[in-house]
Amino acid sequence: MKKIFISMILMLAPLAAAFAQDVVGKWKLEDGSAIVEVYQQGDVYNGKIVWLEKPTEADGSPAVDDKNPDPKLRTRQVLGLNMLSNLKKGNGEYSGGSIYDPGNGKTYNCSMKVEGDVLKVRGSLDKRGLIGRTMDWFRVKE
């Protein structure tokens, strides 16, 4: 009986690991324009842009955050920019944080949920997530 119990535990361990989906890693945006690396910092999760489809402007200079509402930040490079901030893990999702869109210079409330190799990222105007949109990001296998 003891051997059967141990065998069952050994067989179920990989299954449990599969259900414990981790958000940490690299994710490609649904339009393929960027890759964001999600990382844990203390008890929160953040994400920075680590790859851009178009990393430079037409003149060859690095793409910058030119739509930022803060004029002092409009010269910072988009590559390396933190776009996900302060997401906390709880109840199978990550929430309570924000997502910054360098395409329009706006910051939205954010929640995320891992579904296999897809990260469902919801940006919304309200904290409950009622007014917004959900994007699918795809895990980058290394």
Where are these regions (language model features)?
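Portal/gating segments that form or line small-molecule/metal binding sites
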Residues: 109-114
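Structural recognition of beta-strand segments within beta-rich domains
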Residues: 28-29, 129
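Central antiparallel beta-sheet cores of small beta-barrel/beta-sandwich binding domains
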Residues: 24, 30-35, 39-100, 105-108
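Positively charged n-region of N-terminal signal peptides that target proteins for export
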Residues: 1-4
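Sec/Tat signal peptide C-region and signal peptidase I cleavage site
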Residues: 15-20
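Edge beta-strand at a domain terminus
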Residues: 118, 126-142
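Sec-dependent N-terminal signal peptides
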Residues: 6-9
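Ligand-binding face of N-terminal immunoglobulin V-set domains in extracellular IgSF glycoproteins
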Residues: 122
